[in-house]
């Protein structure tokens, strides 16, 4: 009986990539798997066809022979499904593709993988810093309780002079298998808990865990401009890996204290400065604090309460951008609440001045009021 073209079976072009072939086989294997189609000979046959086609096209050498000589080039002239010696071979590729997802092993006698390397857990450290540390950057030392390999047993968990023994229940595989239809499902061994070995003489220092707790000092550079909620990732400073797996990461989560002088708006800083209504009317020069030194700010005549002056590049640096925010000086005009009799008289006289009076006369009166209030 003539055989269908392997590319046709998988529904891919002859120049299909390895990933295309794998995706096509995955789709067909799920669609026609016997467990999904019980008592359906046609579905079982299509499952075998897909497995045989994938077996050839996934292998570069077999595929080259097939492309040149057809089915004769791969030694399969007996019809689909005849290229495998047992059901184990037919299900082997299915296990390769889906095993990591579902824990499936192949049919009877499938491969034992044993315990796999596992990455260590990530750790979180909450760090509170001052506003000035956040603004200028700093280097801080963290004291971290961490699990480290036991120096008594070298991390094996076994007492010195002994070593872990192969688990007799699973034969060192770390897994036991349960049959369900065509599948064997790999389960962690309940005796060794997936380790493949058991410790008969635990290390007295770590009690067989292979790890001990130590306080580790770690120097961390805080970049200038950080804000509450920012995270610093320190690779490899988390919990150690298992079975040779990589260590996890340490995430330092920043919390910035409030400042008595400045308020923060993103990378801009806001500072409030109070002036008298005389200063607001006539203008003045006032000192304004910055992150470095005080600077002098010219207040123009007629300044209103709530007016904001922007000092460029006097704010906080942007992380990773090389730019700096601004300093916003918010003016608050203070109205006196307690006046002497003379001050009150001068204010009333000031209020009676017509708008048509010469400006110099108004300014002269304002200066006179300011002098009376001790603001000159």
Swiss-Prot record:
Free-text comment on the cofactor: Binds 2 Zn(2+) ions per monomer.
A GO CC term assigned to this protein in UniProt: cytoplasm
Annotated Zn(2+) 2 binding sites: 167, 170, 189, 192
Domain of life per record: Bacteria
CXXCXGXG motif repeat segments: 150-157, 167-174, 189-196, 203-210
CDD domains in the record: DnaJ, DnaJ_C, DnaJ_zf
Molecular function via GO: ATP binding; heat shock protein binding; unfolded protein binding; zinc ion binding
Primary location recorded for the protein, binned into one broad class: cytoplasm
Subcellular location: Cytoplasm
All residue ranges annotated as the J domain in the record: 5-70
Domain notes: The J domain is necessary and sufficient to stimulate DnaK ATPase activity. Zinc center 1 plays an important role in the autonomous, DnaK-independent chaperone activity of DnaJ. Zinc center 2 is essential for interaction with DnaK and for DnaJ activity.
Family stated for the protein in its record: Belongs to the DnaJ family.
Record protein name field: Chaperone protein DnaJ
Native organism: Nitratidesulfovibrio vulgaris (strain ATCC 29579 / DSM 644 / CCUG 34227 / NCIMB 8303 / VKM B-1760 / Hildenborough) (Desulfovibrio vulgaris)
Gene transcribed to yield this protein: dnaJ
């Amino acid at each position: 009986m003539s055989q269908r073209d392997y590319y046709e079976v998988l529904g891919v072009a002859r120049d299909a990539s390895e990933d295309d072939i794998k995706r096509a086989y995955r789709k067909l294997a799920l669609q026609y798997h016997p467990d999904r189609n019980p008592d359906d000979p046609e579905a079982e046959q299509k499952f075998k066809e897909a497995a045989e086609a994938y077996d050839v096209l996934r292998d570069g050498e077999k595929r080259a022979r097939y492309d040149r000589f057809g089915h004769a080039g791969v030694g399969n002239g007996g019809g689909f499904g005849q290229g495998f010696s047992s059901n184990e071979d037919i299900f082997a590729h299915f296990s390769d593709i889906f095993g990591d997802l579902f824990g499936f092993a192949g049919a009877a006698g499938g491969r034992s993988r044993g315990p796999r390397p596992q990455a260590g857990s990530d750790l979180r450290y909450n760090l509170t810093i001052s506003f000035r540390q956040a603004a200028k950057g700093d280097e801080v030392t963290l004291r971290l309780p961490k699990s480290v390999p036991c120096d008594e047993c070298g991390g094996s968990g076994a007492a010195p002079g002994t070593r872990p023994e192969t688990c007799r229940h699973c034969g060192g595989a770390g897994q036991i298998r349960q049959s369900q239809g065509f599948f064997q499902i790999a389960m962690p061994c309940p005796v060794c808990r997936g380790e493949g070995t058991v410790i008969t003489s635990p290390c007295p220092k770590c009690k067989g865990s292979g790890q001990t707790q130590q306080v580790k000092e770690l120097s961390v550079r805080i970049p200038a401009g950080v804000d509450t909620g920012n995270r610093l990732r320190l690779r490899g400073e988390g919990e150690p890996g298992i079975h040779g797996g990589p260590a996890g990461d340490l995430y330092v989560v920043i919390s910035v204290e409030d400042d008595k002088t400045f308020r923060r708006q993103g990378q801009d800083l806001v500072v409030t400065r109070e002036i008298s209504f005389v200063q607001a009317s006539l203008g003045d020069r006032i000192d304004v604090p910055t992150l470095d030194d005080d600077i002098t700010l010219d207040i123009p005549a007629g300044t209103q309460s709530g007016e904001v002056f922007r000092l460029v590049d006097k704010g906080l640096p942007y992380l990773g951008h090389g730019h700096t925010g601004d300093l916003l000086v918010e003016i608050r005009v203070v109205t006196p609440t307690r006046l002497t009799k003379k001050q009150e008289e001068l204010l009333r006289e000031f209020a009676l001045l017509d708008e048509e009076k010469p400006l110099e006369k108004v300014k002269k009166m304002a200066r006179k009021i300011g002098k009376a209030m001790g603001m000159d």
